[in-house]
Amino acid sequence: SAMCNDLANVVISRHGTDRQKERFLRPFVEKPLLASFCLTEPGAGSDNSLMTSFLAPRDDGSYVLNGSKCFITNASYASQFTVLCKIGKPSSSFMACVVVPAESVVAADLPDVGYATREIQLSTGGRIVIGKPEDKLGQRLSNTAGVTFEDVIVEPDQIIGNRRYGFKYIMDVLDFARPMVAAIGLGLAKRALDLTMAYTRERKQFGSRICDLPVARDTLTAMWKKVELAELSLWKACWKIQKNDKDAGIFASLAKNTCAEAALFCASEGLHLHGGYGFTAEYEISKLARDAHIIDIYEGVREVQNMIIGREIV
């Protein structure tokens, strides 16, 4: 949830005007509010060109937003939505980045939605309908739901930067988001390694600690190597981004892939070394194994990261 807040708001801090920063970011400084970043659609995952959400101009100079997004983090509790949408019509080649304020309500003050929907009638016109939260395999404490914008009125000052450059702005933001996802993966991989080391040091089989058995030691060594390499890749990506290097994007993709791979490997092999106990909910390693898979998917699947890297190095 914290990462998604940053993802939804960093595009405003990087590409918004001073007036937009004051209007859309100040509430998040003053209160512990949640924001949602609305990119993925039911028919548009990795290929954003297939999205159909669109912003149509009105005679008075304002716009009307219609469309549906899916797999949106914080959706059920969000006070503000950052949305990428087409301009003019669903088939347009241009995209805008739009900020839609909803309800300035601290998430803790909202009732626990459980598996209920949420509907927000906007005072400016139109409504936002948040669907039933997804029942996910992992990261179950993170709220995820679909969001539908129905005839939502958007004023020109809610559009970030040039209305045709929304896709460019979002791609820029994802260079910041991918190291954050990588950090989640690295933390998960480290936790899986620590749990597995502790378990295999304590449990004995064939007259020896499991960690002393050659096959187990090889696996633990491989896990450690994955973690260390992932951490190095993440440090370099952050360093590149801080320096604003032109090739920062490929190192963000490298860190995302490397840390996701470490998370998947360490969680899977860690569960394996726990034996049957690892397959029970009583042991934390089972939760890590469920949580690890999404790290390889969101903010760009590994194949997309490889495409980004391959395009730049060639």
Regions found by a protein language model. Name each.
Residues 43-52, 122:
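Active-site-adjacent elements of ketosynthase-type condensing enzymes
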Residues 2, 7, 15-20, 30-31, ...:
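Alpha-helical interface subdomain recognition
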Residues 36, 52-54, 80-84, 97-99, ...:
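Conserved hydrophobic/aromatic beta-strand scaffold that supports enzyme active sites
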Residues 150-168:
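Long, acidic (Asp/Glu-rich), low-complexity accessory segments flanking structured domains
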Residues 24, 50-51, 68-70, 132-135:
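Short beta-alpha junctions and helix-cap segments that line functional grooves
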Residues 62, 66-129:
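A short core secondary-structure module
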Residues 43-46, 71-74, 86-89, 136-143:
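Short Gly/Pro-enriched turn/cap motifs at secondary-structure boundaries
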Residues 31-39:
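A short, Trp-centered hydrophobic/proline-enriched beta-strand micro-motif
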